[in-house]
Amino acid sequence: MSESKRGGAQLARAVEKAYQAGQDDYHLEPMVLVENGKPVGKIGDGDAAVFCCRRGEREIELTELFTDPDFNKVQRNQLKDLDFVIMTMYHDKFKDLPIAFAPSHVVKPLAQVLSEAGKNQFHCAESEKYAHVTFFFNGGENAPFPGEDDVCVPSPKGIDFDQQPELSLPAVADQVMGALGKYDFVVTNFANGDVIGHTLNTAAKLEACKHVSHYLDVVVHDALAKGYVVAVTADHGNIEKLYTAAGKPDGAHTTNLVPFILMDPAHSGPIALRDGCLGDVAPTVLNVMGIPQPAEMTGKSLAEGHDFGKDRKMLLIICDGWGLGSGDDGDAIHLADTPYWDSLLAEQSWSKLHASGEHVGLGSGKAGNSEAGHSNLGAGRCVMQDDVRLDAAVKDGSFKKNPIFLQAIEHAKKNGTALHLLAYLTYKSSHGCIDYPLAICEMARDAGLDRVFFHIIFDGRSTEPGSAPKLLAELDEKLDAIGVGRIVDGVGRGV
């Protein structure tokens, strides 16, 4: 690859050397463009920066690094007069930052309806998925509703997740069983299907499936013995698909349907269930518990014809990244030793739910993700996701008129400084898309700002393994066509 004034070729060579040293895209160590012994494109006083990612998960910590004066997890210099823009509101602690696409609030999510009905509730997950059973499940609310207790179990630290495929599931199961009998509603997330599904380690995936099956057995039996109606479902697919069409290990989300299993210990016969989508789960919970469904919830109960009686309690288990696969040698759940899971499908009442694309407020044909999944599960309706709002803005031209972006560009122009774009190098991740920073780069060019620096986050999940050099070459060409912009550093998203 030849030298490039845009920096992509230089970064691509560094990536290829990292591959030779055994690194992959997800775990690429930081690499920086250097000229005359100095790093190029450092963020400095008076600059503007746009975090071109749309999810409120890993983005939170990096935003804290730049904006929170009390952040102390790493040593850093506090920059003066930095205009730091976030694409969406990753957390309500950032509500006073400039937000390009501020959230539309979910009115009357399940947790609020339960609270207003006088029911107490328990939300529990390990830290990798804690935000999903709280912030996302609760419609964007960070604070628990009255009567709601939230427990976060730390995920393993200092070790690659595929080396501990059970993650912290044993501790999560213990917390859930400790809550059963004390709360009217319990929701939990079993993270393994997604977290281990994102790795490329087939043996670890099979082991993860085994652990999920085992702890489903333990927790479900305890809940049924205590009189709880139990639902087991998923937020999207992932671990069930081991290989890409080219036969390579696959760590990406899928568009597969997900199961909805419902068990009522007070009823020995089958429960008539219909197929539906994730937005039908919250209405089902309300149906089970005998609580009127608010008009804001447009989903419908999946078990409308079943008489659950009065004063019922319910456990909802969300198996993250646990889709209905092909049932062959390319399906991890099928291959794994999962006797209890197999018995659920063989002996219990269950239906199929849509968990991707327009059914959960994503773009047509797009794989589901944890944020969309949990927001739909908790909202009881289809919740329009950020990628649809953003893509619509790009399509109708309003993206390039966004006043928050224009203010950031003007800030850099006024100070005679630079605009920095923090961006995922991918076209289809639920975290973001390289098209967003490219559009902002064009805006900067049109406004007469030529100092624009790209800070790349290598995805390693939605992209093919080893594809970073090719994607960097494509980005180089696009920046050449725009006429401004330089790629100055990169790091894997898992570092």
Regions inferred by a protein language model and the residue ranges of each:
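Feature captures the catalytic ectodomains and active-site-proximal regions of enzymes
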Residues: 1-495
